[in-house]
Amino acid sequence: MEPRDTGISLVLVTRNRESDLTRTLETLKGALCPCPWEIILVDNASDTDMSRVCKASGLENLRFFRTEENLGPPGGRNFGASQARYEYLVFLDDDANFIGEDALVRIYDRMNREPDFAIFAFQVRNLEGGLYNWPHGKHRLPRKDGTFRTKYFLAGGFAIRAAWFWALGGFSSQLFFWGEETDLVLKSLALGGEGVFYDGSVAVLHRVHGNGRVKDEGRFYYQVRNRMYILKIRFPAGISLCYRLYYGLKYLREAVCLGWLGTYRRGLRDSRRIPRKGSCRLTLSRLRAWQKLSK
């Protein structure tokens, strides 16, 4: 990729969420930013014309793109990033918004002050005001408003340096749904990255109740398929087998309880059929570095 100009490209991917998108764009009208910035909006093959939402927003720095097919969240984000002009990529879900007008100011400042890090996680809250899908462990809850190194981020609200994003090949679009965040961090560590920098001073409201997750058979399929794939291609061979046995049995028990054995078998089968793109496998030392990021 060509060198990027100084600034922020805010990437939004939407699909059939006109009202959510309208609200998100409305919140961006008062956003403060200390550098040039743009909004890249990707319509991921919605059933209706989403361009009218963009026109109605009146946002002059918004650029609209539409894909001809549903690329899934990781593919849609990759497409949006490929259109970006600036060196810092910030991703936000279409049903989310920053809490506070100075979020981009904080992001820009943090990324400038932490040159050793490429991936930045934010604090994500739900409609009740609680934390949304806090992945960093209970021991870090007292530091939710502070900073720390971690191995997790939520793709619905995070930032990454464009140069590093493309050095990693972006998100693994072949996953289509679920697990792309973990996969990106594993690729980053495999190539010598420093993990993820969490900045709790940047807050995102994900406009859902609770953790917003509904246990359904479709999600279960992608969990089985993608986790088995990620473990196989990212972890050292022997350790990969141990992890796959553990999760294989875990998902099997779940499938038996829920009556989803057919879906379980299909997920296992399809995990072996996902095409590989590039090779970023952790060494044993980098796997240990990944594990230490949870402590």
Per-range role (PLM):
Residues 26-36:
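Short, acidic, metal-binding catalytic loop of nucleotide-sugar glycosyltransferases
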Residues 101-132:
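Conserved donor NDP-sugar-binding/catalytic core segment of glycosyltransferases
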Residues 193, 198-217, 226-230:
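Active-site donor/metal-binding and catalytic loop motifs
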Residues 67-84:
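Glycine-rich, basic loop-to-helix element that forms the pyrophosphate-binding segment
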Residues 27, 43-52, 96-97:
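A conserved acidic beta->alpha catalytic loop
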Residues 152-153, 157-160, 164-169, 174-203:
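A short, conserved alpha-helix in the catalytic core of glycosyltransferases
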Residues 222-223, 237-295:
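Non-catalytic, C-terminal membrane-associated alpha-helical segments of glycosyltransferases
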Residues 89:
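Short aromatic/hydrophobic "clamp" motif used to bind/position activated sugar donors
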